[in-house]
Amino acid sequence: MGKDVTEFTYEGKKYTPQSFLEMTKLNLNDYVTITSFTHVPFYKSFILDIPDNFSYGNFYNMPLDEFVQNIDNALDNGYTVALDADVSESTFSGKNGVAVIPASAEDKKTILSEIKPELKVTPEFRQQEFENFNTTDDHLMHIVGKVKDQKGNFYYKVKNSWGSESGQNVSNGGFVYMSVPYVRLKAISVLVNKKALAPKTKKSLGV
């Protein structure tokens, strides 16, 4: 990975990693990482065994519906959300600017260009796909809003890092429109401001 970065320039000013953090005025204690799995108790923190969690960070576990509801609650209240997700599915496409989970194998051929029914993702199926390594922690992105298609289906507007120009083989200015079923199945976790959590979740977690 190379040498540690000790100094860099941002908008014409030099920073160290520490001075840049101070400039942002972010208090890292204001944030929590939430997730949803069935192999650990709900509303407890635990260390998730994934390669990217090399620092042994804690995750708060909760039911799948509540996990998604907290993403919505954050966005509806003006907060954005950091996302850790699996992007290895053939139906995650930066080129097409969408990430979806088709209800049938046949629809995989056309779902990137046509609106098709999507899979009903249960907690049990999510857990199964994680345990058999079909879901892995591939990529970090940034959920900044929601959009709706012609049939009224909601998608999360996800800022990706694969470029923003059409010549870079991306669509939607580099954003990916990620369906709710995709998030239910393939979102490993999200980092969210404590103030953006739903009141019930705050109480259950004691934060």
Residue ranges and their predicted role:
Residues 1-207:
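Active-site signature of cysteine proteases
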